[in-house]
Each structure stands twice: as structure tokens, then as C-alpha cells.
Amino acid sequence: MHEWGLSEELKIQTKQMIEIAEKELSIMRNAIDKEDECILCKMEDIHHMLANVQTLAATYYIQAYLSPYTESSSFITTAIQHLSARKHGALIVVERNETLEALIQTGTTLNAHLTAPLLESIFYPGNPLHDGAVLVKNNHIVSAANILPLTKSTEVDPELGTRHRAAIGLSEKSDALILVVSEETGRTSFALNGILYTISL
């Protein structure tokens, strides 16, 4: 049985952020009756605060989602940190309970022991393997330059790039966890069960 509870430090941070959001909601509720007050700015502030709460929680849960399926989760997160800092785009699929062979168009077979430097080198711009997805199973990189199914959901942000659409697409069809690094912003996220979560590593 997995332990999904938040750490004590994260509980405190999350509660503090929620309390601030509650105060802002109260201020906004009172401002509705005032003709000289605009609540749109307040709504944007609250949206930003709640997004930060989600990012905080998602960052914690990523380890809980990964650790039962690979002992190399720390190598994966280290690689993600470095790739993000350099704005090197990346797409990493972690196979969990369901096999992915029927869903992925296999690229180049590697069957290599997973290390952070190897992951980083695969996604180095110009590397022939960097455009597709890496498939991780247990503690091994099974293959690279894999092609994933793209989401067809009309609810997905139209500004999302191919990597993010591929991550969501595979997560809609399997229990895999897919990590993404944006090459435009360096922002990191993961897709699970058809939902994309922003994380800060």
C-alpha cells in the first residue's frame, strides 16, 4: 500500500497558501457590491495562488508516483532539473503496471542502465534521438526516439506543443507517467491519467 500523505513541511506550506487564497476570496466577495472595484484582477491573483498550490503538491507526489516503479527516480529528477535549466526539451515515459508496446511506435532500442548523464545526453539538441520519447522500465532505458499517440481532446490548451500533447495522449490510454520539459520555457510537468501537472524540481 502506497503512502500518499503530504509531508509535514508541505502540509504547512499548502495550508498557508490556501489561507491566503481564502482571504483573497473574502475580499473579492465583499468587492462585488462596490461599483468602483474590479474583481478580475483578484480572480487572476487567486488563480495564480491555487496554481502554485497544485504545483507544490504535484512536485511532492511525483516521487510517490515514480518510486514504486523505478529505483532510479532520483536520476530521472536530476536529469529533469538539468534539462530544464538548459531549456533542452525532453519527453520521458515511465512504464508502470500496463505494458506500452502496443501504444508506442518504437524508435531506437537501447536497453541501457538508467543514469542522469545518459538521459541528458539523449535530449541534447542535435542528438538524433532527442526528438522522440525515452521509454523507462524499472531501472533501464528501453528505447529512445519513440513516437507517442497525440491527444485528441478539445479541452487541451491549444498553445501546448507536440511533446505535451504526446504526454497527455499516452496518459489517456495507459497508466504510464510521462515527464515533459519545454524547450521554449524550460518548464517541467508530468502527465497522468490524461491530466498535465506543472512541477518545480
UniProtKB/Swiss-Prot annotation:
E.C. designation(s): 2.7.7.85
Catalytic activity: 2 ATP = 3',3'-c-di-AMP + 2 diphosphate
DAC domain location: 54-201
Phenotypic effect of disruption: Spore formation delayed by about 2 hours, about 20-fold decrease in spore formation; 2-fold decrease in parasporal crystal formation, 30% decreased c-di-AMP levels at 18 hours growth. Double cdaS-disA and cdaS-cdaA mutants are viable, but neither double cdaA-disA nor triple cdaA-cdaS-disA mutants can be made, suggesting c-di-AMP is essential.
Assembly, per entry: Probably forms a homohexamer.
Protein task: One of 3 paralogous diadenylate cyclases (DAC) in this bacteria catalyzing the condensation of 2 ATP molecules into cyclic di-AMP (c-di-AMP). It has slow DAC activity with ADP as a substrate and may have weak ADPase activity. Required for efficient spore formation, whereas in B.subtilis, it is required for efficient spore germination. It is produced under the control of different sigma factors in the two bacteria. It is also required for parasporal crystal formation.
Note: This strain no longer produces parasporal crystals, but can be made to do so upon transformation with appropriate plasmids.
Domain notes per entry: The N-terminal region (residues 1-69) is required for activity, unlike the B.subtilis ortholog where their removal increases c-di-AMP production.
Protein name as annotated: Diadenylate cyclase CdaS
Gene name of the record: cdaS
